[in-house]
């Protein structure tokens, strides 16, 4: 099969036909120049060999024009994004984080440890083979996969199974997906959290330098965005997801945050449209 060079442009249309909300589209237009500057800074860091990967995010804030009907939103997410994990964290009636995460950080149940590498993105209407053959997306994906390998080795877990890479759809976007699993006697969930988070799926490579530049480029505190969210039981079983594709309802406002991974071969316009589609993917469930 002919491989797609990272220098070539994969024809991607990130336009969504499932939401037509003038106010939200106006917010996207207003934020486009700022987002473009962020993405271009990220691309320059890659091209200057300062970083190998960086995940740049964008946040939109708008007033909630009525009481948040969380049950209805979760019902729509369950129908429209069956492959995602729906999550809610309610600190109080005026601070609620919710969403539909495509990414499992890890789970441990009945001696089976499962990790997921989820990175590399395309609109769900794009031919899956194009995503599987895109060198840019494979590079982005492999940074996450290799980080998981390194983390397992640091945890002295050297025997594991790597499932075949595939494409999974999450609403209007699809991702490259690789499962890694290992049968082990026991593992401390807090140790897994320490080693696995933040992965290159939400941060970058090298991690320390990427964190510095993310804090420099993004003008907001990520807060709950991209944090681990999950549970641990008394037997040590656990399941943690990455709190992305989500929103935060706080003080009668809604914050929606989404990001995109920038690597060698990234094209600014594609990254901007990818971020906007991710924002739209959740906004349509809230605003419709």
Which functions belong to the PLM regions below?
Residues 2-33, 37-40, 63, 114-216, ...:
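Contiguous alpha-helical scaffold segments within structured protein domains
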Residues 46:
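Hydrophobic pocket-lining residues that define ligand/cofactor binding sites across diverse proteins
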Residues 54, 86-90, 223-230:
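A short glycine-rich, hydrophobically flanked beta-strand micro-motif that places a catalytic Asp/Glu
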Residues 55-59, 153:
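Short hydrophobic alpha-helical segments that form membrane-spanning helices or hydrophobic packing faces
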Residues 58-143, 159, 236-259:
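An anion-binding catalytic pocket shared by soluble metabolic enzymes
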Residues 59-60, 91-97, 148-149, 164-173, ...:
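A glycine-rich phosphate-binding loop feature that marks nucleotide/adenosyl-phosphate handling sites
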Residues 180-288:
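Conserved hydrophobic core element of enzyme catalytic domains
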């Amino acid at each position: 099969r002919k491989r797609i060079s990272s220098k070539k442009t994969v024809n991607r249309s990130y336009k969504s036909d499932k939401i037509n909300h003038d106010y939200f589209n106006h917010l996207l237009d207003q934020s486009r120049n700022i987002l473009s500057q962020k993405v271009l800074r990220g691309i320059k860091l890659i091209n200057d060999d300062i970083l190998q990967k960086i995940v740049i995010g964008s946040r939109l804030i708008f007033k909630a024009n009525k009481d948040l009907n969380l049950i209805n939103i979760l019902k729509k997410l369950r129908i429209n994004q069956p492959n995602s994990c729906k999550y809610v964290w309610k600190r109080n009636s005026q601070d609620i984080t919710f969403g539909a995460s495509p990414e499992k950080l890890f789970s441990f149940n009945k001696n089976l440890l499962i990790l997921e590498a989820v990175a590399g993105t395309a609109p769900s209407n794009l031919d899956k083979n194009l995503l599987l053959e895109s060198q840019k997306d494979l590079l982005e994906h492999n940074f996450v996969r290799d980080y998981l390998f390194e983390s397992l080795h640091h945890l002295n877990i050297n025997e594991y199974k790597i499932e075949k890479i595939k494409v999974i759809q999450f609403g209007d976007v699809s991702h490259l997906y690789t499962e890694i699993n290992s049968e082990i006697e026991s593992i401390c969930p807090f140790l897994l959290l320490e080693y696995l988070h933040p992965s290159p799926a939400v941060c970058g490579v090298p991690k320390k330098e990427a964190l510095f530049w993310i804090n420099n480029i993004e003008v907001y505190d990520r807060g709950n965005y991209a944090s681990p969210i999950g549970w641990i039981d008394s037997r040590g079983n656990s399941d943690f997801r990455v709190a992305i594709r989500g929103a935060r309802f706080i003080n009668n406002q809604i914050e929606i945050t989404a990001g995109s991974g920038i690597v060698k071969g990234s094209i600014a316009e594609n990254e901007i449209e990818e971020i906007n589609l991710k924002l739209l993917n959740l906004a349509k469930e809230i605003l419709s």
